[in-house]
């Protein structure tokens, strides 16, 4: 999944902080622990790293809550299938809700394309449905895997720090 608080394909590009502001606001005002895991692959735009660094760096102003950013990278494999070897998951999961979408997280995907998204909750909004539990399990599996690295393992241009 790609993330940018801007349009990517519109001309001229424009700033679109809807999600960016929401992540910062819930961490700052409600003490929520936000974890973002984005894909890192051959087609990752260099500009994405500065946006993700900005979210991670916001932690220094938080007295409670947090924002943690990780990059998930599927290992290279000697195969020439275009747009493969990437984690294409696009979802958000909370304690009791899952939001699943076909859209990358940038303005154009929500304002100019015909993607689809849906929200899943338990019958009682305080309960976690089995699907939400499963989506949360997939997230935690990937988050804790060897393929998930802190944004700080990469420089501002996306080059690995060694």
Language-model features and meaning:
Residues 3-162:
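PLD/PLD-like phosphodiesterase catalytic module centered on the HKD motif
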């Amino acid at each position: 999944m790609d993330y940018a608080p801007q349009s990517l394909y519109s001309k001229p590009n424009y700033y679109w902080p809807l999600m960016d502001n929401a992540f910062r606001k819930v961490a700052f005002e409600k003490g929520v622990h936000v974890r973002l895991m984005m894909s890192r692959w051959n087609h990752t735009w260099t500009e994405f790293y500065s946006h993700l660094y900005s979210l991670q760096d916001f932690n220094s102003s938080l007295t409670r809550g947090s924002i943690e950013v990780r990059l998930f990278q599927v290992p290279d494999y000697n195969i020439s299938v275009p747009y493969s070897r990437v984690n294409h998951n696009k979802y958000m999961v909370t304690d009791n809700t899952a939001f699943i979408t076909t859209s990358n997280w940038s303005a154009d995907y929500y304002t100019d394309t015909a993607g689809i998204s849906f929200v899943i909750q338990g019958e009682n909004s305080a309960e976690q449905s089995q699907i939400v539990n499963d989506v949360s399990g997939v997230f935690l599996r990937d988050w804790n895997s060897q393929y998930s690295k802190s944004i700080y393992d990469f420089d501002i241009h996306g080059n690995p720090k060694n």
